[in-house]
Amino acid sequence: MAPTQPRDAQRSRVYRAETPLGGRRLPTLPDCAAFRDDVVGSLWWVARFPDHDLAKAPILRPGNGARQAFYREDPGHPTITLPRRYRTVGVVLHELVHWALADAHDLPNHGRTFTRILLDATAEFMGSAKRERLAAAYIEHKVHVGPPPRVGPAGGYDYGWDERLRLGRGRRFLVDYDADASAQGTLLSRAHRKVTLADGEARHVIPERTIWRVRGSGNGRTAR
């Protein structure tokens, strides 16, 4: 059974921070689709989310009568609903980040991992000035942002490593570190820049600076 998704505590603050920023308008759904394809087909996106490619990209829906834009896992294919007033590059990016994290059920929908990815994507696809405005708005509205992703030996990016460790005490993880080492166990502590996992009687103490990927393992929380 997958772990229960954490409470989406900063959702409203994220919305308040993003709303004034605007962004280039995309008047029609084909315009939105062209921007979606530019993002998902870019080297930047492929390097970070190789399993989320153009063939699997969300279908765009007009949202006639809908009051807001939203991402949804519909049967057979994900969708993004875009009412006319929400057809901007900023909104499309926001919803694409939800798609990138669709399988991350152990992370909040608008948590630190989400805001870090959106901040990085804003810099890449909307420019550094817009990125700085978004970063300032996050600070103003007390939105928490995760640290940069860790990059593994093969060049893969892990954005969720920090938030998983932050929220995951008592959960089982598979932690990859150094060039080719890994350890599995229940997270006991994260202190003094070290992560401690328990696997039966064994204890794994891993320097945090060496970690490049953290994945859930087993069946969620251990029995208490």
Predicted regions and their residues:
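Active-site recognition of the HExxH zinc-binding catalytic motif
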Residues: 90-103
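Surface-exposed beta-strand edges and their flanking turn/coil or helix-capping segments
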Residues: 94-96, 129, 210-212, 219-222
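Secondary-structure capping and boundary motifs in well-ordered enzyme cores
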Residues: 84-89
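Metalloprotease/metallohydrolase-associated module, dominated by Zn2+-dependent proteases
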Residues: 7-81, 103-213
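Short intrinsically disordered terminal tails
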Residues: 1, 166-167, 217-224
